[in-house]
């Protein structure tokens, strides 16, 4: 495939991804069943399987923590689910109940999450499972949160018809994509890590500002989702890993 064909194919895929942000008429019938008109509950076989997965993840901690809840959040717990959705499984823990320092706990759980997610390739009805440890006091902006532990909605989603500006999302996504491609093309140099961390911070703050002002359907959050689904976030993280590996290696 030529470079031109790759660019055309990439733009086509991006448009398909942005199209997937549109809301559906119902929640995913692979995960939920309609109990009564407009009210959905999680399928019991799915709920039990997700509890098994969360138990396996919690066992990997090697330390006892009280689990306040296990929840499904993200697009799969909402009307904007699509083929690109993940099963976002959040384990809710109160960090203040621990004797360990907050920053140490965050680093510990992030490390456990990364190792577990990389080690496993679990799918629920074709959707990838991603686990995460969430502090009970953490601000988590989501209009759909389902308690798997208790079998009920913490926040029941409402069907909305958001005004999604496809062009704006695609343009911003392309802008960030070019910046990431430029870093990759430059390769591993002395100041590359500084640029990577700077861009990661910029993207994170860009997304967070959108979540705080416009919620899940803000163009900032949807631009981030585009970058994650088209592989650009992973491309940036792979470059960071390659740089770290080179820094820690000793040449023959």
Functional labels for PLM-detected ranges:
Residues 1-11, 19:
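Proteolytic processing junctions in secreted/extracellular precursors
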Residues 13-85, 93-252:
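Catalytic core of pol beta-like nucleotidyltransferases
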